[in-house]
Amino acid sequence: MAIDKHATPMLDQLETGPWPSFISGIKRLRDQHPDARINAVTNDLLGQLEHSYETRKGYWKGGTVSVFGYGGGIIPRFSEVGKVFPSSKEFHTVRVQPPAGNHYTTAMLRQLADTWEKYGSGLITFHGQTGNIMFIGVDTPNTQNFFDEINDYGWDLGGAGPCVRTAMSCVGSARCEMSCTNELKAHRLLVNNFTDDVHRPALPYKFKFKVSGCPNDCQNAIERSDFAVLGTWRDDMKVDQAEVKHYIADKGRQYYIDNVITRCPTKALSLNDDDTLDVNNRDCVRCMHCLNVMPKALHPGDDKGVTILIGGKRTLKIGDLMGTVVVPFKKLETEEDYESLVELAETIIDFWAENGLEHERCGEMIERIGLANFLEGIGIEPDPNMLSHPRQSSYIRMDGWDEAAEEWFARQAEAGR
């Protein structure tokens, strides 16, 4: 049956630019999908969006929608103009956790798409900044039906609200030669251990895990996660001098100096007269620029592990925060190594849950109570690698210095150092 299409003159303008338009995608569902229900839903969605553009006002409001046994994972959206656009008056979003490293098979994707077209609008986002697969547009009764079906063949809801959120990891060694750790294993162990905290919000605010296999940090873990695991190495960078000479012969000596040598932030690289490369590994800060420019000539070292940073977040209360190093280097090879990683995460979340204020991220708590108190609370000794910059004031308080020194020496003696 033909539907009465809403006029969308303002939305039509979004299709005139050089880039793909989400409006075109929604119109294809409205005009070409064989399911009349999806045609009607997307038609009213376009109508409401056009109305919002005309009035410069959003008409979605929140509410409470969940599936049995879960306290999160659904983003409720109810329309304030549902009488005018009845087919899209309930347009909830379902967050579904992706596989570690976003490794899918086409069969998995077809199965998910078929189930979503059966119950939802047909609109899917891979992936939001949360890391989830976002299934956008389902009414309240079909929310449970959709979840039941995908859960039967192995998928689970992601996090929403004050809980442990969906973890993310890069594709890792599956296609990246810079990988320094088993990203997918670390990802799965953390997610599996905190599944209950993902589904039942009971924390001060959100807590995110992200795992990047090398300092390139393709997952933006340093900037966007409360618990960032970054692959790294602590021995010397591996240099293939023959490939260095080949690169210089191909690009030219001046190009090499301008785009590799002078781009090193700590001036750790120098080019010899015979076109070989010297690396001052002590000064290398793992910025990865030279390795990215010359992936055949330069490679991470053999002594690989991870660096753990805590407290990254984007703007909310006190602006953007980069993660703070709490473990400069940790091997992840044995099962005991991975268990200790999970135990550290448990300790940090427990401390934050007890000491964080409502709606306060872990990094904001560290800013409030101080890094020294945070490290003491989670049982980690301070390390010079945790400093982001030298002291800015030469005036410091010395009261309590002797007692603090005695406590430090006592801890060192207890640890047998």
Curated annotation (Swiss-Prot):
Disulfide bonds: none annotated. Siroheme binds at residue 218. [4Fe-4S] cluster 1 binds at residues 170, 176, 214, 218. It catalyses: [DsrC protein]-trisulfide + NAD(+) + 3 H2O = [DsrC protein]-dithiol + sulfite + NADH + 3 H(+). The keyword Mitochondrion does not apply. It holds the Pfam family NIR_SIR_ferr. This is Sulfite reductase, dissimilatory-type subunit alpha. It comes from Allochromatium vinosum (strain ATCC 17899 / DSM 180 / NBRC 103801 / NCIMB 10441 / D).
